[in-house]
């Protein structure tokens, strides 16, 4: 598969590194030679110094026979123009990074397709949706719904009150449990567990279950005493903060703190009256306490500085806030942030990359999530007739090491999978796998 990535900024560089490990034919183009200099020598990809809006430059990188053209420069207009040109030169599919929500409205989708832009990616909106998912419940690190919530993936950290510590999973399976443990994150290692593995204190455990049994997962995880989120404090008035404030449920009260007065005035215009805008320094603990930090269930740090976000979440934790979320755009800091136990880590580069990665897959995939600090991916496949996954019961499929089937949705009903489950055409199957394994599992669904 020939993939051209236009823009060697943070998103483009991360995506190029990710895809180069897949042994795809990757070309990364940018008009800044300095950005490209270290990449070609360290990764299996070609770099070309050329403008993505130059017809000659696009011809040089071979846009005419590109299977996928991805424009992720910081400039929305350049991305749209580059995709239009690439399509007219012969590129089969194009993706543009944007920062304008209006472009995503369903009524505009066909309009952009006619212009030559097949898909639009808005990283800030994707990040905001991830944040809202993670703060819906204070006891959950990750929360993802499949097929409208028929099946749910929950990631939560094991504390002292957890009921399932130090018990082999095969013993837990002897009770007719309404969940499946799909992965365990322990220190810097992610395990796809087997029957003799045990859950230990401080592990982050990923469960799949149905909505009916979410309270049961909360009970066995020892999180029943965690307060439900009603009050949310956001530090930093970025575009992600705006989208987050717009997406939170109506029952949540939101405060945004930012030290730029002009930005605060702009936020007041953009957001409705239920969101309180405070002009002040979010690093000032006295200010945060005065604004009700001790009565806040969720604290979200979204400044442009990863270090500030990490430290602010640590401080909020010490003040008794049960749920903290930090935007950490420096990938090198993600592991450290997790080891400091700051809560949920958001990285829009990784979120964007996982959405684009989905477009490369040949099987019918409706959802791909990148679990950044777990080094794992979760994907929702739709099963086709005569595909390999339907030939045997799950226990006899011979799935690659590092992969597991978390559950399936059949006729709108979530089902927790066991070894004796027979997967049928039309099922929606949720697969959990270690990072970069999706292509290996994909062949089972073709």
Predicted regions and their residues:
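Cytosolic regulatory regions of ion transport systems
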Residues: 1-446
């Amino acid at each position: 598969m020939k993939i051209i990535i236009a823009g060697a900024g943070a998103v483009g560089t991360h995506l190029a590194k990710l895809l180069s490990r897949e042994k795809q034919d990757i070309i990364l183009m940018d008009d800044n030679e300095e950005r490209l200099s270290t990449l070609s020598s360290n990764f299996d990809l070609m770099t070309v110094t050329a403008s993505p809006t130059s017809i000659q430059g696009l011809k040089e990188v071979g846009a005419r026979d590109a299977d996928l053209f991805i424009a992720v420069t910081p400039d929305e207009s350049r991305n749209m123009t580059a995709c239009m040109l690439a399509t007219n030169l012969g590129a089969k599919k194009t993706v543009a990074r944007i920062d304008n929500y209006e472009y995503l409205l369903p009524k505009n989708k066909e309009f952009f397709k006619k212009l030559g832009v097949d898909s639009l990616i808005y990283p800030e909106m994707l990040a905001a949706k991830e944040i809202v998912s993670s703060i819906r419940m204070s006891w959950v690190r990750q929360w993802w719904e499949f097929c409208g919530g028929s099946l749910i993936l929950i990631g939560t950290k094991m504390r002292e009150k957890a009921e399932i510590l130090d018990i082999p999973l095969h013993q837990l399976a002897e009770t007719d449990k309404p969940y499946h443990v799909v992965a365990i994150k322990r220190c810097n290692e992610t395990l796809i567990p087997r029957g003799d593995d045990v859950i230990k204190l401080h592990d982050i455990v990923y469960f799949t279950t149905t909505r009916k049994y979410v309270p049961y997962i909360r009970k066995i995880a020892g999180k029943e005493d965690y307060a439900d989120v009603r009050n949310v404090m956001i530090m930093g008035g970025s575009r992600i903060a705006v989208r987050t404030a717009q997406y939170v449920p109506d029952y949540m009260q939101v405060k945004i703190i930012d030290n730029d007065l002009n930005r605060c005035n702009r936020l007041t215009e953009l957001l409705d009256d239920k969101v309180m805008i405070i002009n002040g320094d979010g690093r000032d603990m006295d200010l945060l306490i005065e604004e009700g930090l001790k009565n806040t269930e969720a604290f979200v740090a979204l400044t442009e500085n990863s270090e500030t976000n990490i430290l602010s979440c640590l401080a909020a934790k010490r003040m008794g806030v049960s749920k903290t979320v930090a935007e950490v755009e420096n990938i090198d800091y993600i592991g450290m942030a997790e080891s400091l136990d700051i809560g949920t880590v958001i990285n829009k580069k990784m979120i964007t990359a996982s959405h684009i990665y989905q477009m490369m897959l040949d099987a019918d995939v409706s959802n791909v999530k990148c679990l950044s600090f777990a080094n794992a991916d979760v994907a929702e496949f739709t099963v086709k007739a005569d595909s390999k996954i339907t030939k045997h019961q799950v226990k006899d499929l011979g799935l690659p090491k590092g992969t597991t089937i978390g559950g399936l949705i059949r006729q709108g009903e979530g089902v927790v999978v066991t070894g004796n489950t027979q997967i049928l055409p039309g099922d929606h199957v949720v697969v959990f796998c270690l990072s970069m394994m999706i292509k290996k599992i994909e062949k089972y669904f073709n």
